[in-house]
Amino acid sequence: MKQTTINHSVELVGIGLHKGVPVKLVLEPLGENQGIVFYRSDLGVKLPLKPENIVDTKMATVLGKDNARISTIEHLLSAVHAYGIDNLKISVDNEEIPIMDGSALTYCMLLDEAGIKELDAPKKVMEIKQAIEIREGDKFVKIEPDSQLSLNFTIDFNHPVIAKQAHHFVFSKTAYKEQVAKARTFGFLQEVNYLRSIGLAKGGSLNNCIVLDENSILNKEGLRCEKEFVCHKILDAMGDLMVLGMPVMGKYTSFSGSHKLNSMLVKAILADAKNYEVLIATDPAKEFALQKAFA
């Protein structure tokens, strides 16, 4: 297996979720061993995707460096992870990645348009070697060794529409596009009203978010799938795990996890070299195993 980038540049314009202003997003190819690099084109600031550059995880995963910030990176990164892209330049002219329809579907379509190009260098994959768990009250995220990437997520909301949902997702690009990519972000009307009162969620609408009142979904079209709520959490987790800098082989499990816990998990993995091994696809046996895991 070889490292990849996109075949040619692509771009789109969309609205930022919190500021509600138009944002131009440009994806450009990068050479081998460059990784995922964000760029604020309006400020001329480069923001490499590294755990130490994650500066906020309250409402979204936020990248920051030299007084420049880029918020809501997780949906795009989730698609990048699913497509196995190792090297990519992501430029925006404002401080948010466009929310689009609230899922990763638009970004999958954009990557399909860009095409995937193999580079000369061998692909690197992180294999988890021992279990790591992060807890906050009854909430937790955990990752442990496995020969593939799987995500097991459970959510439990005191709401009649959501209640308790669980989904076990074994990664493949096809399964991601069928089960996960279309799952939209969601929020509660009371929270949306509060966020707007403090100058946030200005770009949020029924076109890019599932909104719930006390008893029901306000979106007339309803849900895209029965487990859309928990599948969106899996979408987010795949984006947050991309901060590791490469695809990961491991069994991820979460109960009511969050961007904050995912970020803490990423940092905990990298804090001790005994937690992981970087596999380089140079010998046939490893290459076969990696191809099977990331089909």
Swiss-Prot record:
Swiss-Prot/TrEMBL keywords: Hydrolase, Lipid A biosynthesis, Lipid biosynthesis, Lipid metabolism, Metal-binding, Zinc
Name of this chain's protein: UDP-3-O-acyl-N-acetylglucosamine deacetylase
Main enzyme class: hydrolase
Signal sequence, start to end: none
Location of the active site: 259
Highest classification ranks of the organism: Bacteria, Pseudomonadati, Campylobacterota, Epsilonproteobacteria, Campylobacterales
Catalyses which reaction(s): a UDP-3-O-[(3R)-3-hydroxyacyl]-N-acetyl-alpha-D-glucosamine + H2O = a UDP-3-O-[(3R)-3-hydroxyacyl]-alpha-D-glucosamine + acetate
GO MF term list: metal ion binding; UDP-3-O-acyl-N-acetylglucosamine deacetylase activity
Purpose of the protein: Catalyzes the hydrolysis of UDP-3-O-myristoyl-N-acetylglucosamine to form UDP-3-O-myristoylglucosamine and acetate, the committed step in lipid A biosynthesis.
